[in-house]
């Protein structure tokens, strides 16, 4: 399997003398299997450079699958400048997770309206098939592609590609589900020591991968001011990848403010962190233009997580029960959820919440912990004791952002734990992720 980075920057392109080594173009990665199957991850501004290269040196006609992690601008802004799209006879399949409000062609055509661009999407000469991709494993030629929702304020997917006996993951954009990563009373660096179920699931997705390309936009010092923006720190990524048994790790989606000297320092700190954990993982910051071929090196592959084909595209029409005594919170959550097509019912106390579970059969529950009378822990305990409540997805929404509250919530059966405050897009993404994984 062949890999090349065409864009490594996050948020906005950052050309200039201070970004020559690591690159200034936004996200775009090319992977080619031994049999010639070509996959392109994301179409940031790096896609323009890739397109020019393929026009000069690529096969004629050209065929490729484009896997978009999500449709934020820095991941699609190179799409109209990808020259092979204009060539009749070329064939492309463009895949992305289904959004809540618009179809993939609508999103891509939005940036190509005449107000912004001289050519519309319908004028492209190549044959283009658009496909909403769901969580699960998909066969694409001689490769297997597995998709999994990431923790991001928009619906974003990470991808695991298995081909030529090797595995590669592309994970942009993703934020830790919880900080710190580890249980305080357990040994760091082990899968079972991960505190939040979401982070453990993320680690399982990476389990024993040969190559992982992961968003690592921030330093630990920068992260508190950027929390809920949907990006990781190099320390989180290095630790979780090492715990997952990853062999090769590329840190990418570099912050626009991080010049070459800064990224060199981040690379060194990440390598020192991996070494301090006793890990053999090889860590690098992704460099635009870097290319290498790799193959599977023998180590245990038996623990790779199995991802079931569960369609999350219909998660925009769930019946969601909000149980919270804070009316302002209920209003905020109701507006956010109804905007994406959910049906919302509400209770301001635990007793009423349990009654509504019986009478309205919700698909998912948002549950506060601190309520008068019956607190959220007791609601969870009673809910899980009922036949119809054992597998019901429950997201705990609480101002208690401490480890003990998170740990106790999971012990009582919570599916996810989200500390207040949160953004509406973040809530929608977590609802989709929670619903998708509740039955796995």
Identify the residue ranges that each predicted region occupies.
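Active-site beta3 strand of CheY-like receiver
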Residues: 360-366
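Cap/insert and terminal regions of metallo-dependent hydrolase folds
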Residues: 177-281
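Charged docking surfaces used in two-component/phosphorelay signaling
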Residues: 331-339
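Alpha4 helix (beta4-alpha4-beta5 surface) of REC/receiver domains from two-component response regulators
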Residues: 378, 401-418
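Binuclear metal-dependent hydrolase catalytic cores
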Residues: 1-183, 203, 259-304
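Acidic catalytic/metal-coordinating carboxylates
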Residues: 348-352, 375-381, 388
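C-terminal output helix
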Residues: 404, 422-431
């Amino acid at each position: 399997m062949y890999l090349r980075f065409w864009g490594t920057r996050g948020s906005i392109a950052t050309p200039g003398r201070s970004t020559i080594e690591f690159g200034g173009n936004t996200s775009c990665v090319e992977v080619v299997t031994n049999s010639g199957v070509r996959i392109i991850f994301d179409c940031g501004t790096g896609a323009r450079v890739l397109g020019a290269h393929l026009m000069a040196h690529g096969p004629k006609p050209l065929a490729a699958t484009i896997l978009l992690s999500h449709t934020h601008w820095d991941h699609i802004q190179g799409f109209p400048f990808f020259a092979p799209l204009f060539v009749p006879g070329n064939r492309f399949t463009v895949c992305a997770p289904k959004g809540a409000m618009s179809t993939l062609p609508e999103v891509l055509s939005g940036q190509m309206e005449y107000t912004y661009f001289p050519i519309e999407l319908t004028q492209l000469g190549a044959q283009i098939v658009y496909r909403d991709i769901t969580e699960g494993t998909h066969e694409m030629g001689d490769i297997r592609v597995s998709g999994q929702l990431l923790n991001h304020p928009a619906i974003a997917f990470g991808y695991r590609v298995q081909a030529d006996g090797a595995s590669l993951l592309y994970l942009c954009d993703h934020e830790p589900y919880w900080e710190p990563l580890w249980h305080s009373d357990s040994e760091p660096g082990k899968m079972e020591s991960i505190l939040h179920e979401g982070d453990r699931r993320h680690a399982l997705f990476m389990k024993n991968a040969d190559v992982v390309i992961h968003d690592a936009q921030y330093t630990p010092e920068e992260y508190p001011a950027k929390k809920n923006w949907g990006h990781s720190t190099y320390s989180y990524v290095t630790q979780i990848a090492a715990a997952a048994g990853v062999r090769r790790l590329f840190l990418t989606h570099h912050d626009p403010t991080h010049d070459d000297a800064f990224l060199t320092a981040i690379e060194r700190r990440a390598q020192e962190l991996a070494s301090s954990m006793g890990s053999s993982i090889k860590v690098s910051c992704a460099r635009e233009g870097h290319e290498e071929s790799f193959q599977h090196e023998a180590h245990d592959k038996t623990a790779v997580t199995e991802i079931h084909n569960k369609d999350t595209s219909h998660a925009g029409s769930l019946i969601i029960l909000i149980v919270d005594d804070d009316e302002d919170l209920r209003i905020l959550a109701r507006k956010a959820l109804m905007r994406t097509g959910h049906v919302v019912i509400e209770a301001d106390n635990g007793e009423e919440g349990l009654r509504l579970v019986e009478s309205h059969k919700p698909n998912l529950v948002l549950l506060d912990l601190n309520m008068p009378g019956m607190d959220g822990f007791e609601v969870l305990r009673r809910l899980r004791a009922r036949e119809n409540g054992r597998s019901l997805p429950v997201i705990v929404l609480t101002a208690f952002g401490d480890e003990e509250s998170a740990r106790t919530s999971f012990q009582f059966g919570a599916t996810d734990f989200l500390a207040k405050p949160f953004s509406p897009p973040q809530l929608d993404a977590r609802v989709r992720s929670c619903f998708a994984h509740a039955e796995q």
